[in-house]
A protein has these predicted regions:
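Intrinsically disordered, low-complexity boundary segments flanking structured domains
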Residues: 1-2, 70
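Generic detector of leucine side chains in alpha-helical contexts
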Residues: 38-40, 45, 55, 92-93, ...
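Conserved beta-strand hairpin/beta-sheet module of binuclear metal-dependent hydrolase folds
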Residues: 3-50
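Acidic/polar short surface loop at catalytic or gating sites that assists cofactor/ion binding
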Residues: 85-108
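Surface-exposed, flexible loop/turn segments at secondary-structure boundaries
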Residues: 18, 70, 89-91
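Active-site metal-binding motif and surrounding structural segment of the metallo-beta-lactamase
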Residues: 29-31, 42-85
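Residue-level preference for alpha-helix termini and adjacent loops
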Residues: 9-12, 58, 77, 88, ...
């Protein structure tokens, strides 16, 4: 996973494995906001570990820009965070994301 500090309080992450998927973190004085998660668990866990170790703030919110697995399936790695998304994003996660996740679980 690639990581870059974009500005004083903004970090950019990019998957090394899947489709150059990107995610971001906006850091405040007491907590952080994650914008999308990465495609693979190891990469999203790497983001989380970086935030906890290097930035020393909890993630309070995760914003999903859309429902695709490579942007939203990592939500589960931020259990204390509130997930924010458009209502249609939630509907599509339920309609399409949940069946896709079940299929992936059966295949692995």
């Amino acid at each position: 996973m690639q990581r870059e500090r974009v500005s004083e309080n903004v970090y950019w992450f990019q998957s090394d494995v899947y489709a150059q998927v990107t995610a971001g973190v906006i850091v405040g004085p007491q907590w952080a906001v994650v914008v999308d998660t990465l495609a693979l668990p190891d990469e999203t866990l790497g983001m989380r570990d970086f935030i906890e170790r290097e930035l020393s703030v909890p993630v309070r919110y995760v914003i999903n820009t859309h429902y695709h697995a490579d942007h939203a399936w990592g939500n589960c790695f931020f259990p204390g965070a509130t997930v924010i998304a458009h209502a249609r994003c939630r509907e599509l996660l339920e309609e399409r994301g949940r069946p896709s996740l079940e299929t992936a679980r059966r295949q692995n």
